[in-house]
């Protein structure tokens, strides 16, 4: 079985593995279920100052990461991780979803290009057929945090990461799961009563048919209230 390998291009290599070195992702890293390497883009910078950016043609605010610098760093990444699919976290990209995550895992070799400043030269995207990917309709300081988020999602889908792989079927957004792509139902644990708030009695009944019906009803109600667009295919 091939493992997931991610090559990460960044100007802040110390940010990795970051949170991915802990909890489930960290355990999976130690078990060699996934691996990574980091390339410091600044190592390919120009002049003694290792410049990696410049002013934008046509004017505008902010600096743009240079294509010659990025090209050299990407060529190095492809030498380390040939046949990899390359992703660039960007607000212009296709929105990352659970189904998109499964699609990404069809290729276990991935390269993440973490942008900074105003972004990267468009010619880099064209030259390397880079796929732009967005984690939401908001702006961050760079591509490192989205890359960590995307990798965390991918890693927990890998066999051997979760103690019980069936857990995935009862989570939000799982199209083939218990809630058919909707949001997960409300969850409860001990104590049975906390600050005068009781666990719904049906969950204590032991009647699995009624419990399953309650969970599906809860999921539908919560999805309709908070994410009604998810119901279109239900």
Swiss-Prot record:
It catalyses: guanosine(37) in tRNA + S-adenosyl-L-methionine = N(1)-methylguanosine(37) in tRNA + S-adenosyl-L-homocysteine + H(+). The lineage of its organism: Bacteria, Pseudomonadati, Pseudomonadota, Alphaproteobacteria, Rickettsiales. Its EC number is 2.1.1.228. GO terms for cellular component: cytosol. Specifically methylates guanosine-37 in various tRNAs. SUPFAM superfamilies: alpha/beta knot (SSF75217). GO terms for biological process: tRNA N1-guanine methylation. This is tRNA (guanine-N(1)-)-methyltransferase. Belongs to the RNA methyltransferase TrmD family. Keywords: Cytoplasm, Methyltransferase, S-adenosyl-L-methionine, Transferase, tRNA processing.
